[in-house]
Design a protein with these regions (language model features):
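Acidic, low-complexity cytosolic segments
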Residues: 1-156
Length: 156
């Protein structure tokens, strides 16, 4: 199960965070981000960190990938496959890249609603439900058309 998904700038600023674990009331986000950045800096050669201390020092796996000025990070439990998680990170970035025509940090800042919609199309309750890029983009485009029609109708 995916416990959390984060998008951080290289300087450690949270651009997106979604937590799927049920005991997140004990989560200190700034401490989590500091812990993530320290572990990423220590592990320059790998994109998978085992025994990552998560909520209440429970051990999880941290899988991340760097894209330009951002880190896309998944915190997963022991049952989740690390290589599948890395592949899923690539799917997320391909979808974001197609939607935003070359995704960068400013897109995360200016379009959080679109970002949450796209992530929710792919993950539900910590489980990956969709990895087909074309289906995700089609659903996104359908939603944008629907929102545009509603805006035109209700703004009269």
């Amino acid at each position: 199960m995916i416990e959390s998904i984060l998008i951080l700038s290289k300087t450690g600023i949270i651009r997106f965070i979604k937590i799927y674990s049920s005991n997140d009331e004990n989560l200190n986000k700034s401490e989590l981000v500091n812990n993530i950045l320290i572990n990423i800096q220590k592990s320059e050669d790998t994109q998978i960190i085992y025994d990552f201390p998560y909520i209440n020092n429970e051990k999880r796996k941290l899988v991340y990938k760097s894209f330009g000025g951002i880190y896309l990070i998944l915190i997963i439990d022991e049952c989740e496959n690390e290589l599948a998680s890395l592949d899923f990170i690539n799917v997320i970035m391909k979808v974001l890249d197609e939607i935003f025509k070359g995704v960068c940090e400013i897109h995360m800042i200016m379009n959080p609603d679109k970002l949450y919609f796209l992530i929710d199309e792919m993950i539900c309750g910590g489980m990956v439900i969709e990895t087909n890029k074309e289906d995700i983009i089609k659903n996104y485009n359908d939603k944008m058309k629907f929102d545009d029609v509603n805006y035109k109708y209700f703004s009269k």
